[in-house]
Amino acid sequence: MSEKELMKVVGFYEGLSIDDPKSFIDEKEQIPVPSSRDLLVKVNAVSVNPVDTKLRQDNGIRNALRILGFDGVGKVVAVGDEVQKFSVGDRVFYAGTTTRAGSNQEYQLVDERIVALAPKNLSDEEAAALPLTSLTAYELLFEKFG
């Protein structure tokens, strides 16, 4: 995969009403190259998370496209030089972060520390619905209630 290859992304520049035709924009961007502890994941499925809807409510206009998508499932297609837990070909799922482009794109860089192998008994679509909600439930059950 060369650095000059393009991928499809879906994002927004301005938090418009969802029924506005410009509320989401299809664009093309370069496929990123992983470094350090990053995985490059070919995204197979995503879910809509409450975090996505909250981030969309930002009414400011920005110069850069904002790509949402907090939860995702896909196949690892490249790894950074410090990655230890995953290999090319692994099917993974993850909850993203608000500091990076989200999963509403064909390929996504994800830090291996927020990734897990996707459950084999779930479809991509089913697994995509789990990451952040599972973490929230875990925190409630084991960190709050002990």
Features from the language model and the residues they span:
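Eukaryotic N-terminal low-complexity, Ser/Thr- and Lys/Arg-rich leader segments
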Residues: 1-8
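Short polar catalytic/cofactor-binding loops
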Residues: 12-17, 46-48
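Short glycine/threonine/proline-enriched tight-turn/helix- or strand-capping micro-motif at secondary-structure
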Residues: 19-30, 59
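Extracytoplasmic/periplasmic beta-strand context in beta-sandwich domains
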Residues: 27, 90, 105-106
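Glycine-rich beta-strand-centered segment in the early N-terminal region that forms part
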Residues: 30-47, 57-99, 114, 122
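NAD(P)H dinucleotide-binding glycine-rich loop of Rossmann-like/cofactor-binding domains
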Residues: 95-146
